[in-house]
Every structure is written in structure tokens, then in C-alpha cells.
Amino acid sequence: AGDRTIFAFSEDYIADENRPTLGLSFKTALGELITEFRPYQKRLMPYFSNLLPEGHMRTYLAERAGVNPEREFFLLQALGADLPGAISIRQADGAGGTADLPDDSIDNESDRTSSGSQALRFSLAGVQLKFSAIQEARGGLTIPARGVGGSWIVKLQSQHFDHVPENEYSMMTLARMIGMDVPAIELVPVESIANLPTEMLTTKGPALAVERFDRLPNNGAVHIEDFAQVFGVYPADKYG
């Protein structure tokens, strides 16, 4: 009720000896499946909280969806069509979107009427402004409709620190030069990225395009789990 959430595995999942692993945090030290979890208030349990964006990106996507950014259950419901790794979130009855969000999860009347048409249905964890993008056969990158899909990540300039994309590009290039395995990267003009939301075109400087390691050429996805999820650490606590 309200902002109180409880996670539970389905009985079929629990009974399946060949079930896929959702995350190491759902197993005991001996590898047994944990099946009882405490309730959480407002925030989700750390595993799911770490699937959500942080900082300005979180605020931006929440505003587009008309959802209070602090109410994580409703935010995950709004963004859950395309999450990091191979996880997706949908309502138990198979319905999707924010049409069935309770009124008190939405900030105001204008957000309530616009949330369906304005929302972007994706999430990329972290604080940096970034979007998933499609590499077009003719060349160039396109932000897909609703933000869902794409095998590249486009990272925009930071609002707080100068030249973050250029710095990351330099570090990745140096890593490749010393023999480390790094993904394909490219610095691209922001204005060359098709379908990027117009409010992002004011960004000064190039964006960094990085090929996603959690996406496959056949539109498949690779299941991933970061250390914050493994150890049950909330995003705000992982930086220090």
C-alpha cells in the first residue's frame, strides 16, 4: 500500500531447479535461493534501486513520465521497458506504461495528462546524462522512439564538470593502447545524433558514443549485475 513494497519470487521460479539467476544478492553464502524479504518504504530494495538513473538524468526522466523521482516503485514501472542488462519490468497482468499509475504517484495535473505522451521508457544507471542509441546502417546514431532499444550509449557533457566525455574517451584510448579490451568508442557532435531531445541540444562539446556490452547483435540482451547490487548497497552510498 502507498510506498510500501515487498519483493517475492513466483512459486514457479522457486520450484524450478534450472531457474536463471536474478542476482547473487538473492542467494545465501551456500548458494541457496533466498525467498523471504523485508518490506521497503519509498525506496526499492538495493538490487532494483540500482537499475534506476541518478542525479539530473533521474529528475529529467521522471518529469517526462510525470512521476515523482523519489517514489522508486512508480519510477521503475515507468522506465522498466528497457533496463540495464536483460531485465525488464511489466505489470503482472501484462499491461505496461504509466496509464495505471495511482494519482498520488504523479506530481501534478499537467504531468498526469502528459505522462503517457512525453515519457521515455528506458533507464541507464549512474549520474551522467546519457541515452541508448541505435547505430544506423547508413551511419550515424539515432535515439529510438521512447528511448527503448539501441546497442550504443551516448554520454553527454556534464552540468557540473568540464569535458567528461573527452576525458573518458582519452582513458579508454589509453587502455586500448596498453592492451586492455575496451568497447568501440567515438566522440560525436551532439547535433549529429538524430532524435535527441531538443532540450539536450544546448549541451556544449561532443558526446561520447560507447558500444554497449549488455546488448547483442540480434537484439538480445546480456544479464548483468554490478557490485552495488551484489552487496546490497544503495546508489547514493557507492561513491564514498
Segments the model singles out, each with a brief description of its role:
Residues 1-240:
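Phosphate/dinucleotide-binding and metal-coordinating scaffold of catalytic cores
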